[in-house]
């Protein structure tokens, strides 16, 4: 009985140790053209609790950061628990709904083998005066894939 109990405790400890090694991580601090918060919507300089979308973009009521280039530069930071990425995948979509389904209708970079933390857009032509959304995930080791980041509008 005592051996069974000790074996059970050892097994649970082992599982907890393994579980700590395979943690849920995702990229953070996403930037578009080096802007940290291009998705913030402001009114008289105050950040509003609104998500940047095409309707807000078309009104002159709010202040926003407009990304006008057709090839924006995307940057990100690894999760604090990660050491180094060996590759990444970037998705750009015309709607947050598509992006939440992991569909990049404008660009799916596929797996890019690189340790870089930035990538120039290389998808379908972007139009000015339109809102787009992007997210990214990375591989830390060949067998370890992070979760996708939270979507970011630009």
Where in the sequence are the language-model features?
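Extracellular acidic, Ser/Thr/Pro-rich low-complexity tracts
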Residues: 78-84, 140
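Terminal edge beta-strands and adjacent linker/stalk segments
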Residues: 150-153
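Positively charged n-region of N-terminal signal peptides that target proteins for export
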Residues: 1-4
